[in-house]
Amino acid sequence: MKKKSCTKRIIAIATAIIITIASIFVYINIKPVSVDYGMSELYTQQDMDSAIELIKESINSRKGCKLYSLSYAGDNLSSKELDYCNSLERSEELFTECIVFDSCFRSPIFGGGGWNANSLYYWNWYLARTDDGPWQLVSWGYA
């Protein structure tokens, strides 16, 4: 009789652990991206949102990665990095605007493809455009 009671207790504990882990996994994966627009005299929230969409698309194309947060790096850095953005592109037309975001995202749970398994990455994203045109993602990675 004691053996059945012990087995039931073990099954109940194992089930509770599995449900807890599954709940945490679901919460992490459905948690919305936190966006900090900061203060800008250069860009509207709409300008930033269109740039953010490109960043989200890039993260989502990296199978298994989960974006947690994006923060506008500020007007000073964005203005300062315009020359850097222009140095990266082989376009006939120079960019007139640059916007920089900081991010935090998690790599795939099991890693692979150059990722460390289930690790947080803190990358910068550089986007540029010409005369209020569409943003182009020109650089990303560690600062």
Which residue stretches match the model-derived regions?
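Flexible low-complexity loop/turn motifs enriched in small/helix-breaking residues
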Residues: 2-119
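Short beta-strand edge/turn micro-motifs at domain boundaries
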Residues: 120-143
